């Protein structure tokens, strides 16, 4: 790029911010040539097949970005805190699955990292905990008050009767959601619901979300079979076309 003319090629992105553009006059990007006003930074967004300039405000809101892009395992790359349910669950079998997953993760963490995964009861979580940690929530909106606080702000809707993913509805009595999402109580941190690390022994790998059909086996273990799974779009919503 020269001081006034910038050229860029992109792949698989729909917005970006250019810096050091105080003398910029044109930006050539993916075949589009944009006339721009010099500024310390320029915000560009793709609208269909073409690029255009945008205000910083137009780029506001939830966006996937470094340290907030998923999938589930990303929440364990920074300080995290497991949150144990203490209330009355909507459905016993789904709650058993959540407790078994928390126990599996705790044992795996001790085995692999020679330490204990930090955990607190949902009734003991403080504002400082929310500010400083990714929260790994186990249970359901009945048993875990943190899940209850954020349930209405998640793209997957979860009530006592159903779990709704876009145009699909699953019975909450025999299904449980797993997901990662920016914490509605602190959008700079994650919440994860009903999953520990998913790349370890005994764990199923997911993207950003999954719905598991749960069933109790003869040995007392509650297994989860993937009924639905996917990746949220760049605005952390369910994509119109599955990614």
What are the residue ranges of the model-derived segments?
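Surface beta-strand/loop "capping" patches
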Residues: 1-12
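Solvent-exposed alpha-helical segments and adjacent loops
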Residues: 7, 15-243
């Amino acid at each position: 790029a020269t001081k006034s003319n910038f050229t860029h090629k992109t792949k698989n992105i729909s917005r970006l911010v250019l810096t050091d553009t105080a003398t910029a006059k044109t930006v050539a990007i993916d075949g589009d040539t944009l006339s721009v006003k010099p500024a310390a930074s320029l915000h560009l967004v793709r609208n269909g097949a073409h690029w255009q300039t945008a205000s910083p405000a137009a780029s506001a809101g939830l966006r996937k970005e470094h340290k907030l892009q998923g999938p589930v395992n990303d929440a364990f790359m920074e300080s995290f805190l497991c949150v144990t349910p203490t209330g009355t669950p909507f459905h016993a079998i789904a709650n058993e699955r959540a407790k078994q997953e928390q126990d599996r993760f705790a044992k795996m963490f001790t085995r692999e990292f020679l330490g204990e995964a930090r955990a607190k009861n949902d009734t003991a979580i403080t504002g400082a905990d929310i500010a400083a940690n990714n929260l790994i929530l186990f249970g359901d909106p009945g048993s875990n008050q943190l899940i209850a606080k954020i349930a209405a702000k998640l793209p997957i809707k979860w009530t006592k009767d159903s779990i709704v993913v876009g145009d699909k509805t699953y019975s909450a009595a025999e299904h449980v959601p797993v997901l990662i999402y920016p914490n509605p109580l602190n959008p700079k941190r994650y919440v994860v619901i009903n999953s520990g690390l998913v790349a370890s022994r005994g764990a199923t790998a997911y993207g950003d979300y999954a719905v598991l059909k749960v069933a109790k086996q003869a040995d007392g273990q509650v297994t989860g079979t993937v009924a639905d799974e996917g990746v949220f779009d760049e605005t952390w919503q369910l994509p119109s076309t599955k990614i």
